[in-house]
Amino acid sequence: MTNIRKTHPLMKIMNSSFIDLPAPSNISSWWNFGSLLGACLAIQIITGLFLAMHYTADTATAFSSVTHICRDVNQGWIIRYLHANGASMFFLCLFLHVGRGMYYGSFTLSETWNIGIILLFTVMATAFMGYVLPWGQMSFWGATVITNLLSAIPYIGTDLVEWIWGGFSVDKATLTRFFAFHFILPFIISALVMVHLLFLHETGSNNPLGTSSESDKIPFHPYYTIKDLLGLMFLLLTLTILVLFSPDLLGDPDNYMPANPLSTPPHIKPEWYFLFAYAILRSIPNKLGGVLALIMSILILAIIPILQTAKQRSMMFRPLSQIMFWILTADLLTLTWIGGQPVEHPFVAIGQVASILYFSLILIIMPTVSLIENKMLKW
């Protein structure tokens, strides 16, 4: 008798995606982050749904409703902090996932990579709008500053900003539409994830060696289900420790003050996961130039496959490229630190140097180093 999981119309899709999927036998724990991101998305949708039951998207009551969730709703505080810190976990996994793709040459799977970039932009947009919802000081001023950047677009900029705001400043209309978008986007992300997986399963996964795995495959279950489960345990442990011991570690104290359009916080800054892009934005004195650099800091990922000059796919056996990759990692950490500092000497200068280095490494240095390695290997 044929197994039901192989014949049932719904089950056979699940079976071919998560059970009998032929996977390379040598993929390391760096390949866990896809499933961890799926887990993060599930946590965010579930906690977000429960928060939406008690939240009111109105400027007069938004801040109070979040306070009400934390104080009066059964286990409301844990749901709220799981959602806030879950976002941090989401981005941590995202950055590691993208870094893995760059290191091991997974960007050669161009459709999967490009859908991934669209996913990254969508998740960033969702997180930004979510940060506005508690209607604290940093929520309000963050929304004002970031949406105002669109006014740098020639000719249509000002009209575009007022159209997004739904008025002449960030107000009730802005909050209402941000809540609507913040609610719908995770479901769009879920659909994009399915497309991401669809394209991935067309080609099969890459592996640490960057070589073809066609001759050496093992079933996804039980080998990688168990391996992913271990990663999930570590993720949940980290998230639980963060939520139960220091839930406000990654937040901003200013957001515990209700939004006040008449009082600007001393340092307007986004959540930690946007700081690297914020530092690049601030390091350019021109407004339009800063906005373009901000967009390009993420969009540059799309041209990495074009810039690939190495004959070897993975960086595993390319020590010079490895050094450049870890310099890039250190540079991103430096930009993250700078983004959280005030706009004064020496932080401005450090930010400008780090921004130039970021673009130079990806556009010029890494492709050149790959060519040198080709010569050294006589390829």
UniProtKB/Swiss-Prot annotation:
GO BP annotations listed: mitochondrial electron transport, ubiquinol to cytochrome c
PROSITE patterns the record matches: CYTB_CTER, CYTB_NTER
Keyword Cell cycle: no
Residues annotated for heme b b562 binding in this entry: H83, H182
Superkingdom classification of source: Eukaryota
Gene Ontology MF terms in the entry: metal ion binding; ubiquinol-cytochrome-c reductase activity
Topology within the bilayer: Multi-pass membrane protein
Amino acids binding a ubiquinone: H201
Keywords, in A-Z order: Electron transport, Heme, Iron, Membrane, Metal-binding, Mitochondrion, Mitochondrion inner membrane, Respiratory chain, Transmembrane, Transmembrane helix, Transport, Ubiquinone
Pfam name, any one: Cytochrom_B_C
Cofactor note: Binds 2 heme b groups non-covalently.
Annotated TM spans: 33-53, 77-98, 113-133, 178-198, 226-246, 288-308, 320-340, 347-367
Any one annotated GO CC term: respiratory chain complex III
Required co-factors: heme b
Record keyword Lipid biosynthesis present: no
Binding-site residues for heme b b566, renumbered to this chain: H97, H196
Location of this chain's protein in the cell: Mitochondrion inner membrane
Subunit structure: The cytochrome bc1 complex contains 11 subunits: 3 respiratory subunits (MT-CYB, CYC1 and UQCRFS1), 2 core proteins (UQCRC1 and UQCRC2) and 6 low-molecular weight proteins (UQCRH/QCR6, UQCRB/QCR7, UQCRQ/QCR8, UQCR10/QCR9, UQCR11/QCR10 and a cleavage product of UQCRFS1). This cytochrome bc1 complex then forms a dimer.
Other noteworthy facts: Heme 1 (or BL or b562) is low-potential and absorbs at about 562 nm, and heme 2 (or BH or b566) is high-potential and absorbs at about 566 nm.
Role of this protein: Component of the ubiquinol-cytochrome c reductase complex (complex III or cytochrome b-c1 complex) that is part of the mitochondrial respiratory chain. The b-c1 complex mediates electron transfer from ubiquinol to cytochrome c. Contributes to the generation of a proton gradient across the mitochondrial membrane that is then used for ATP synthesis.
Family affiliation: Belongs to the cytochrome b family.
Protein name (database record): Cytochrome b
Species this chain originates from: Microcebus rufus (Brown mouse lemur)
